[in-house]
Swiss-Prot record:
The keyword Cell membrane belongs to this UniProt entry's keyword annotation: yes
Biological source species: Macrococcus caseolyticus (strain JCSC5402) (Macrococcoides caseolyticum)
TM regions (residue ranges): 26-46, 47-67, 72-92, 107-127, 152-172, 243-263
Superkingdom field: Bacteria
Protein's name in the database: Energy-coupling factor transporter transmembrane protein EcfT
Entry function: Transmembrane (T) component of an energy-coupling factor (ECF) ABC-transporter complex. Unlike classic ABC transporters this ECF transporter provides the energy necessary to transport a number of different substrates.
Native organism taxonomy: Bacteria, Bacillati, Bacillota, Bacilli, Bacillales
Subcellular localization: Cell membrane
Family statement: Belongs to the energy-coupling factor EcfT family.
GO MF term list: transmembrane transporter activity
Oligomer and partners: Forms a stable energy-coupling factor (ECF) transporter complex composed of 2 membrane-embedded substrate-binding proteins (S component), 2 ATP-binding proteins (A component) and 2 transmembrane proteins (T component). May be able to interact with more than 1 S component at a time.
Keywords from the UniProt entry: Cell membrane, Membrane, Transmembrane, Transmembrane helix, Transport
A cellular component annotation (GO) from this entry: plasma membrane
Recorded topology in the membrane: Multi-pass membrane protein
Length: 265
């Protein structure tokens, strides 16, 4: 299941979303995340879902490809849904059997919060799938440039965030390899009680940490060999270009925001 993790991966395709400036995509996603947290009824969530499908169509990515990326975090979504179903009270009583008491408000809140998670994950995943890691680093650095006046290491922060994001699928792949190696030696991580499964995961941690530190060391050596010395005197082979279609795409947030605020009230 871990090998299906797609967050942090880049899929080079020819599409409108791929051509957009990464700074525009980051600002768009940030504002959309704020709007998603403002959603409070089915109409506003419907707007968010329709928007996701439009963006998917414009990025030439299939819905099933994106949906498969949810499987590694499916447990978190189910856990969130169940927590609200059993703990949130209000509305009509749907089930009342012994200690189990499920009310309509809990079901509604559970579905809405789960939808909120899914929309945010879809948006951020589409951004990483359609943005080159180097361009993503440059975009973060460009957006954080005003903080240079506060003597903050903007370039280093941007590089750190980009590397961390890029290492997510790498570490997931490494975890998958270690799990298969352990299972080939007779270890069964899918059977037994919850306590036994947790114990079975512990042998994964040591080789995974060793591999992560080894990859980090190799990356540091490779950067040093290529003469990387931070932002000082660094030039860029490719520069970010803001086009008219980036401005127009960003302006679509105005009617989207107004519509969500109208439906919210």
């Amino acid at each position: 299941m871990l090998d299906k993790m797609i967050l942090g991966r880049f899929v080079p395709l020819q599409s409108f979303v791929h051509r957009l400036d990464p700074r525009m995509k980051m600002v768009f996603v940030f504002i959309m995340m704020i709007l998603i947290f403002l959603m409070n009824n089915w109409q506003t969530y419907a707007v968010g879902i329709i928007l996701i499908f439009i963006i998917l169509k414009a990025s030439n990515l299939s819905f099933m490809f994106l949906f498969n990326g949810l499987k590694p975090i499916l447990f978190l979504l189910i856990f969130t849904l169940l927590m609200h179903i059993f703990l949130t009270k209000g509305g009509a009583t749907l089930v009342d059997y012994g200690i189990i008491n499920i009310q309509s408000q809990g079901v509604i809140m559970g579905i809405m919060i789960s939808l909120r998670f899914i929309l945010i994950i879809f948006l951020t995943t589409i951004m990483t799938l359609t943005t080159n890691p180097i361009e993503l680093t440059d975009a973060i650095e460009s957006l954080l440039k005003p903080f240079k006046k506060l003597k903050l290491p903007v370039h280093e922060l941007a590089l750190m965030m980009s590397i961390a994001l890029r290492f997510i699928p790498t570490l997931m792949d490494e975890t998958q390899k270690v799990m298969k190696a352990q299972m080939s030696r007779g270890s069964d991580m899918t059977a037994g009680t919850l306590k036994e499964r947790i114990k079975a995961v512990i042998p994964l941690l040591v080789p995974l940490f060793v591999s992560a530190f080894k990859r980090a060391e190799d990356l540091a050596i490779a950067m040093e060999v290529r003469g990387y010395k931070g932002d000082a005197g660094r030039t860029k082979y490719r520069k970010l270009d803001w086009h008219t279609y980036d401005t127009l795409s960003l302006l679509t947030l105005i009617p989207i925001t107004l519509l969500i605020l109208y439906l919210k009230n």
